[in-house]
């Protein structure tokens, strides 16, 4: 079951836009398997985007390509094996600064059933130049991506 938190009564203006999307789900797969789906580009590209390219180390560039959304460049911010994977991403041709990118953080925790509690936090929408529209788009996108990773793990 996934939980999702975003103030539903927020007025979407540049002054009051929520800064963060947060989603958590319980997956019936061990942390090692979920970690691989998040951090190995070939696996990540299988469920998240059309292709994914990176070297798994802090500071490494990443590149995600989407058939209908183009290229999303980024940089890996944190790699804490089996625990946390974070990257900053934005739009092709724009700098990866606070006005043009957001921070995506995945955390993994083993649960009592041998599965994984997976949490995603994407932050930085309040300072994003197109924050109001981007938080709406990404909120829907993360719903779809959580379904996609669950399906990928169930079948792979």
For each feature predicted by the language model, list its residue ranges.
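A generic structural micro-feature
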Residues: 15-19, 68, 96-100, 134
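Intrinsic-disorder/low-complexity, polar/charged segments enriched in Ser/Thr/Lys/Arg/Asp/Glu/Gln
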Residues: 18-24, 31, 61, 71, ...
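Short beta-edge strand/loop motif at the mouth of beta-sheet-based domains
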Residues: 22-23, 42-75
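Conserved catalytic core of Hanks-type protein kinase domains
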Residues: 37-38, 79
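Short acidic N-proximal helix/loop "leader" segments that mark the beginning
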Residues: 1-22
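A conserved amphipathic terminal alpha-helix motif
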Residues: 2-8, 124-156
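Hydrophobic-ligand binding "helix-grip"
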Residues: 53-55, 69-115, 123
């Amino acid at each position: 079951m996934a939980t999702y938190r975003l103030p539903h009564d927020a007025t979407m203006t540049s002054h009051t836009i929520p800064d963060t999307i947060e989603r958590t789900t319980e997956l019936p797969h061990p942390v090692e398997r979920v970690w691989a789906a998040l951090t190995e580009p070939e696996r990540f590209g299988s469920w998240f985007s059309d292709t994914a390219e990176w070297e798994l180390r802090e500071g490494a560039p990443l590149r995600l390509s989407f058939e209908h959304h183009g290229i999303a460049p980024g940089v890996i911010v944190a790699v804490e094996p089996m625990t946390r994977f974070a990257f900053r991403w934005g739009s092709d041709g724009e700098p990866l600064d606070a006005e043009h990118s957001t921070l995506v953080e995945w955390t993994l925790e083993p649960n009592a059933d041998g599965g994984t509690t997976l949490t995603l936090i994407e932050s930085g929408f309040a300072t994003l130049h197109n924050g109001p529209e981007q938080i709406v788009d990404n909120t829907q996108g993360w719903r779809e991506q959580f379904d996609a990773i669950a399906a990928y793990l169930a079948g792979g």
